[in-house]
Amino acid sequence: MNQFDEREEWYAFNQETIDALLEDGSQADADYTIEHHFASTDFDVLEKAAVDAFKAGFEVTDAEELMLDDGETIFCFDAVVERKLDIEKLNADADALLKIADKHDVTYDGWGTYFEPREEGEYEEEEHHLND
């Protein structure tokens, strides 16, 4: 099975991540730096995936070399984009990046972002509505 066939699982991951961020108090309308993770044991293949991610409109970080607990060495990079927490756009990004991962036989390992705290007034306003 290729990774693209697992896209429904990634769509669920995308929604769960958005929900968790918002439930924890992150801003709903903020621009987020979304970092999609790729990995491979073959640097040359990973580099080709990075070129395709760049061509698809993502910023690409320099590849890093990591040693796993079992002693295996892997290489990884992030494909980065600024996005609102828009499920349709995140799902479209996942589709594009899963296809790139399959094309180059590298691992797509999901995405992460940074918490964007709400402004102080937003909490007070929310409390006020809860007490009405």
From Swiss-Prot:
One family name in Pfam for this protein: RraB
Organism annotation: Alteromonas mediterranea (strain DSM 17117 / CIP 110805 / LMG 28347 / Deep ecotype)
Compartment(s): Cytoplasm
Cytoplasm keyword on record: yes
Function: Globally modulates RNA abundance by binding to RNase E (Rne) and regulating its endonucleolytic activity. Can modulate Rne action in a substrate-dependent manner by altering the composition of the degradosome.
Annotated family: Belongs to the RraB family.
Protein name as it appears in the record: Regulator of ribonuclease activity B
Major localization listed first in the record, in broad terms: cytoplasm
Recorded GO CC terms: cytoplasm
HAMAP family noted in UniProt: RraB
